[in-house]
Protein backbone atom coordinates (compact mmCIF):
# COMPACT_ATOMS: atom_id res chain seq x y z
CA UNK A 1 0.00 0.00 0.00
CA UNK A 2 1.42 3.44 -0.93
CA UNK A 3 2.38 5.86 1.80
CA UNK A 4 -0.39 8.34 2.55
CA UNK A 5 0.91 11.71 3.73
CA UNK A 6 -2.38 13.22 4.85
CA UNK A 7 -4.45 10.41 6.35
CA UNK A 8 -7.20 12.77 7.49
CA UNK A 9 -7.92 13.96 3.95
CA UNK A 10 -7.59 10.42 2.63
CA UNK A 11 -10.10 9.10 5.18
CA UNK A 12 -12.57 11.83 4.24
CA UNK A 13 -12.11 10.99 0.56
CA UNK A 14 -12.74 7.27 1.21
CA UNK A 15 -15.89 8.01 3.21
CA UNK A 16 -17.20 10.33 0.48
CA UNK A 17 -16.46 7.93 -2.38
CA UNK A 18 -17.21 4.69 -0.52
CA UNK A 19 -13.97 3.09 -1.68
CA UNK A 20 -12.99 -0.05 0.21
CA UNK A 21 -9.99 -0.76 -2.05
CA UNK A 22 -8.09 -4.02 -2.47
CA UNK A 23 -6.99 -4.07 1.16
CA UNK A 24 -10.17 -3.67 3.23
CA UNK A 25 -8.38 -4.14 6.55
CA UNK A 26 -6.01 -1.25 5.81
CA UNK A 27 -8.94 0.91 4.76
CA UNK A 28 -10.84 0.08 7.94
CA UNK A 29 -7.83 0.85 10.12
CA UNK A 30 -7.42 4.25 8.49
CA UNK A 31 -11.11 5.02 8.95
CA UNK A 32 -10.98 3.82 12.55
CA UNK A 33 -8.12 6.21 13.31
CA UNK A 34 -10.14 9.02 11.75
CA UNK A 35 -13.31 8.22 13.71
CA UNK A 36 -11.47 7.78 17.01
CA UNK A 37 -9.14 10.76 16.74
CA UNK A 38 -11.01 13.33 14.63
CA UNK A 39 -14.63 12.60 15.45
CA UNK A 40 -13.83 11.46 19.00
CA UNK A 41 -15.97 8.35 18.77
CA UNK A 42 -15.53 5.58 21.31
CA UNK A 43 -14.77 1.95 20.42
CA UNK A 44 -18.41 0.94 20.13
CA UNK A 45 -19.36 3.93 17.98
CA UNK A 46 -16.36 3.35 15.74
CA UNK A 47 -17.28 -0.32 15.38
CA UNK A 48 -20.77 0.67 14.25
CA UNK A 49 -19.42 3.21 11.76
CA UNK A 50 -17.05 0.69 10.20
CA UNK A 51 -19.74 -1.94 10.03
CA UNK A 52 -22.08 0.50 8.30
CA UNK A 53 -19.34 1.48 5.84
CA UNK A 54 -18.72 -2.15 4.89
CA UNK A 55 -22.41 -2.97 4.58
CA UNK A 56 -22.83 -0.07 2.19
CA UNK A 57 -19.67 -0.45 0.10
CA UNK A 58 -18.29 -4.02 0.32
CA UNK A 59 -19.93 -6.59 -1.95
CA UNK A 60 -21.14 -9.77 -0.21
CA UNK A 61 -20.20 -8.34 3.18
CA UNK A 62 -20.74 -10.77 6.07
CA UNK A 63 -20.77 -8.93 9.39
CA UNK A 64 -20.22 -12.13 11.39
CA UNK A 65 -17.01 -12.88 9.49
CA UNK A 66 -15.67 -9.38 10.03
CA UNK A 67 -16.87 -8.83 13.59
CA UNK A 68 -13.65 -9.76 15.42
CA UNK A 69 -11.47 -7.89 12.92
CA UNK A 70 -13.48 -4.68 13.16
CA UNK A 71 -13.65 -4.93 16.93
CA UNK A 72 -9.86 -5.28 17.16
CA UNK A 73 -9.29 -2.39 14.74
CA UNK A 74 -11.68 -0.14 16.66
CA UNK A 75 -9.83 -0.92 19.86
CA UNK A 76 -6.29 -0.26 18.54
CA UNK A 77 -6.96 2.77 16.33
CA UNK A 78 -6.32 5.31 19.07
CA UNK A 79 -2.76 4.07 19.64
CA UNK A 80 -1.47 5.29 16.26
CA UNK A 81 -1.64 9.04 15.51
CA UNK A 82 -3.49 10.04 12.37
CA UNK A 83 -0.93 11.55 10.00
CA UNK A 84 -1.65 15.03 8.63
CA UNK A 85 1.28 16.00 6.42
CA UNK A 86 0.55 18.01 3.27
CA UNK A 87 4.02 17.71 1.72
CA UNK A 88 7.71 17.27 2.39
CA UNK A 89 10.28 19.80 1.21
CA UNK A 90 13.39 19.05 -0.83
CA UNK A 91 16.25 21.56 -0.92
CA UNK A 92 18.72 22.69 -3.57
CA UNK A 93 21.67 21.23 -1.68
CA UNK A 94 19.97 17.82 -1.53
CA UNK A 95 19.15 17.80 -5.25
CA UNK A 96 22.68 18.95 -6.11
CA UNK A 97 24.12 16.08 -4.08
CA UNK A 98 21.91 13.59 -5.91
CA UNK A 99 22.70 15.04 -9.35
CA UNK A 100 26.44 14.75 -8.65
CA UNK A 101 26.10 10.96 -8.58
CA UNK A 102 25.66 11.05 -12.39
CA UNK A 103 23.85 7.71 -12.55
CA UNK A 104 20.11 7.95 -13.14
CA UNK A 105 19.22 4.72 -11.33
CA UNK A 106 21.20 5.75 -8.27
CA UNK A 107 19.75 9.25 -8.46
CA UNK A 108 16.15 8.01 -8.49
CA UNK A 109 16.90 5.69 -5.60
CA UNK A 110 18.57 8.42 -3.56
CA UNK A 111 15.69 10.82 -4.20
CA UNK A 112 13.21 8.19 -3.06
CA UNK A 113 15.16 7.41 0.10
CA UNK A 114 15.51 11.14 0.80
CA UNK A 115 11.74 11.64 0.55
CA UNK A 116 11.07 8.77 2.95
CA UNK A 117 13.74 9.97 5.38
CA UNK A 118 12.28 13.48 5.44
CA UNK A 119 8.79 12.06 5.92
CA UNK A 120 9.93 10.05 8.94
CA UNK A 121 11.75 13.13 10.24
CA UNK A 122 8.45 15.01 10.12
CA UNK A 123 6.69 12.24 11.97
CA UNK A 124 9.37 12.13 14.68
CA UNK A 125 11.93 14.82 15.47
CA UNK A 126 14.17 12.06 16.84
CA UNK A 127 14.31 10.12 13.56
CA UNK A 128 17.50 11.76 12.25
CA UNK A 129 17.29 10.60 8.64
CA UNK A 130 16.44 6.93 9.17
CA UNK A 131 14.29 5.11 6.62
CA UNK A 132 12.06 2.39 8.05
CA UNK A 133 10.80 1.06 4.72
CA UNK A 134 11.34 -2.28 3.03
CA UNK A 135 14.19 -2.22 0.48
CA UNK A 136 11.96 -3.84 -2.15
CA UNK A 137 9.39 -1.06 -1.72
CA UNK A 138 12.04 1.64 -2.08
CA UNK A 139 13.20 0.20 -5.40
CA UNK A 140 9.60 -0.19 -6.60
CA UNK A 141 8.62 3.41 -5.83
CA UNK A 142 11.91 4.66 -7.29
CA UNK A 143 11.17 2.71 -10.49
CA UNK A 144 14.62 1.13 -10.37
CA UNK A 145 14.77 -2.42 -11.70
CA UNK A 146 17.64 -4.87 -11.19
CA UNK A 147 18.53 -8.09 -12.94
CA UNK A 148 19.18 -10.13 -9.80
CA UNK A 149 17.80 -9.73 -6.30
CA UNK A 150 21.24 -9.27 -4.74
CA UNK A 151 21.95 -6.38 -7.10
CA UNK A 152 19.79 -4.21 -4.84
CA UNK A 153 22.29 -4.60 -2.04
CA UNK A 154 25.18 -3.90 -4.41
CA UNK A 155 23.50 -0.60 -5.27
CA UNK A 156 23.10 0.23 -1.60
CA UNK A 157 26.70 -0.73 -0.84
CA UNK A 158 27.86 1.67 -3.56
CA UNK A 159 25.83 4.48 -2.02
CA UNK A 160 27.20 3.66 1.42
CA UNK A 161 30.76 3.70 0.07
CA UNK A 162 30.10 7.18 -1.33
CA UNK A 163 28.91 8.30 2.12
CA UNK A 164 25.37 9.07 1.00
CA UNK A 165 23.68 6.49 3.22
CA UNK A 166 24.65 4.44 6.25
CA UNK A 167 23.32 1.28 7.86
CA UNK A 168 22.48 0.30 11.40
CA UNK A 169 25.23 -1.46 13.35
CA UNK A 170 22.70 -4.08 14.45
CA UNK A 171 22.89 -7.22 12.31
CA UNK A 172 19.13 -7.81 12.37
CA UNK A 173 18.26 -4.22 11.40
CA UNK A 174 18.06 -3.50 7.66
CA UNK A 175 17.09 0.15 8.09
CA UNK A 176 19.24 2.74 6.38
CA UNK A 177 19.98 6.39 7.10
CA UNK A 178 20.22 9.21 4.55
CA UNK A 179 23.27 11.30 5.42
CA UNK A 180 22.96 14.31 3.09
CA UNK A 181 19.77 15.94 4.42
CA UNK A 182 20.17 19.73 4.46
CA UNK A 183 17.12 21.60 5.71
CA UNK A 184 19.02 24.91 5.80
CA UNK A 185 19.35 25.10 2.02
CA UNK A 186 16.79 26.74 -0.28
CA UNK A 187 13.58 24.73 -0.77
CA UNK A 188 13.08 24.02 -4.49
CA UNK A 189 10.55 21.18 -4.49
CA UNK A 190 7.53 20.09 -2.48
CA UNK A 191 6.48 16.45 -2.75
CA UNK A 192 2.89 15.60 -1.81
CA UNK A 193 2.51 12.20 -3.46
CA UNK A 194 4.69 9.15 -2.79
CA UNK A 195 3.23 6.84 -5.43
CA UNK A 196 5.83 7.45 -8.15
CA UNK A 197 8.88 9.10 -6.62
CA UNK A 198 11.21 7.92 -9.37
CA UNK A 199 9.04 9.61 -11.98
CA UNK A 200 8.67 12.66 -9.73
CA UNK A 201 12.44 13.02 -9.75
CA UNK A 202 12.66 12.65 -13.53
CA UNK A 203 10.03 15.34 -13.94
CA UNK A 204 11.96 17.67 -11.68
CA UNK A 205 15.21 17.31 -13.61
CA UNK A 206 13.38 17.54 -16.93
CA UNK A 207 13.75 13.93 -18.07
CA UNK A 208 10.23 12.69 -17.38
CA UNK A 209 6.77 12.83 -18.90
CA UNK A 210 4.94 11.62 -15.80
CA UNK A 211 1.78 13.63 -15.16
CA UNK A 212 1.33 14.29 -11.46
CA UNK A 213 -2.31 14.15 -10.38
CA UNK A 214 -3.85 15.67 -7.28
CA UNK A 215 -6.49 12.97 -6.86
CA UNK A 216 -6.30 11.23 -3.51
CA UNK A 217 -5.08 7.67 -3.26
CA UNK A 218 -7.40 4.74 -3.14
CA UNK A 219 -6.21 2.22 -0.60
CA UNK A 220 -4.87 -0.10 -3.26
CA UNK A 221 -1.57 -1.98 -3.05
What is the predicted role of each segment?
Residues 1-110, 114-206, 215-220:
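Modules that initiate DNA replication and primer synthesis
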